[in-house]
Amino acid sequence: MTNVFKGRHFLAEKDFTRAELEWLIDFSAHLKDLKKRNIPHRYLEGKNIALLFEKTSTRTRAAFTVASIDLGAHPEYLGANDIQLGKKESTEDTAKVLGRMFDGIEFRGFSQKMVEELAEFSGVPVWNGLTDAWHPTQMLADYLTVKENFGKLEGLTLVYCGDGRNNVANSLLVTGAILGVNVHIFSPKELFPEEEVVALAEGFAKESGARVLITDNADEAVKGADVLYTDVWVSMGEEDKFAERVALLKPYQVNMELVKKAENENLIFLHCLPAFHDTNTVYGKDVAEKFGVEEMEVTDEVFRSKYARHFDQAENRMHTIKAVMAATLGDPFVPRV
């Protein structure tokens, strides 16, 4: 059976065409519908999936696990203490071993080079569950959520608020540009995206007709926005920068004042989670005590408002990850896109 995705890796959004990403988003919606109606879709019957987690996760682990089981596969979780990537065994050797035992490999960790080496040497499809550079599975969930709310993607405006050089900002910028979505990064100059990432996005935007804007001006960034999106102020491994980030990013918090600047009652709010919108966590209490900040990247008011779609977005991680796994490892009929 013909399948143009068969055997391919999912490492970064830039490796896929607009038509391919749109197909994966639509296939995700189809699989979501099948699950809601309890219709089996076991594209990976009898397959074994390795889930490599150098970085911990709630949503990514849960999504890959449930998606694997729904597809008829067996997922095996290997955490940071279970794998020796680059420590006692090279990534190349680990990849060659796992590729002989598993049919597909998910990796969530720090280095993009590491996930690329797994892909190069394993001989099986490898899926990027997050690296410091890119977060491609998150993007499919994000843009599926946007499409569910607006019925389209092209011509919409998504504004990312906060740390403009993290993996989520990179991926939103490039994926949006590919899909014809206008992406604005609203960030302090010190945290603007890398020039290389902006140049890549601008190249795709030229083809799709999208607009790329990098600014520290709230009015310029947010007016006319369809989507406001934010992420944590400090990424994993950067905890020592907390005081600096709180001071730098407080003006970029998503609050009702910022929402009103968009002048769009149909606006939606997205967050890839976890979110620090109150003090109901150990982390939140600690930050409140040390820095006097009870709400960080988003206020509790916005987080619980009619605009919020982040729990739909979190659920969509499972459906979109399922689509990627089924398309690259299974046998759906996809002669062309």
Swiss-Prot record:
Coiled coil: none annotated. L-ornithine binds at residues 167, 231, 235-236. GO terms for biological process: arginine biosynthetic process via ornithine; arginine catabolic process to ornithine; citrulline biosynthetic process. It catalyses: carbamoyl phosphate + L-ornithine = L-citrulline + phosphate + H(+). Its EC number is 2.1.3.3. Keywords: Arginine metabolism, Cytoplasm, Transferase. Belongs to the aspartate/ornithine carbamoyltransferase superfamily. OTCase family. This is Ornithine carbamoyltransferase. It comes from Streptococcus suis (strain 05ZYH33). The gene is arcB.
